[in-house]
Amino acid sequence: FEYLARPFPVANGVSIPAGGYTFQEVQTSFNAGPQRRIAGRVGMTRGQFFDGDRTEVSYSGRLEATASLMFEPAVSVNWVDLPAGSFRNTVARTRATFTLSPRSFVGALVQYASASQTVSANVRFRWEYQPGSDLFVVFSEGRDTSPRGLPGLQNRGVVVKFTRLFRF
């Protein structure tokens, strides 16, 4: 059950009215063995979506290029039919992780969503400087791809997080 206190815009010109909603869906998928260097999942979901229907076809994969470098591509296509209108949303993303040492890595995630026409990127560095204590540096950026020319900046941020484990 999901309750919306106010209307919720899900796509350009399509909003879901306030109110309570229940969902039922059926899903089928095929998973390739995660123990292999190349693995993945293909799936399909069909079911209710607020006052309408949703069909999703998705793929997610994992490729261990080397012992230190891994890529995880994924794509999801949703066809949504609602009383207020129909739309298709495609979300494509790729995650890459490069392990510098057993105690540090650099990871990046790039994602595109067609319904909002946005692309976002997130780059994260993690260093465990002693067991249980970490330093994270994260750079994030989101851009609107709908106007002509270069994608317009929506948001940008840098976060530094420092944790320290105290043992008693």
Residue map of PLM features:
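Exposed, low-structure sequence patches enriched in small/polar residues
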Residues: F1-F168
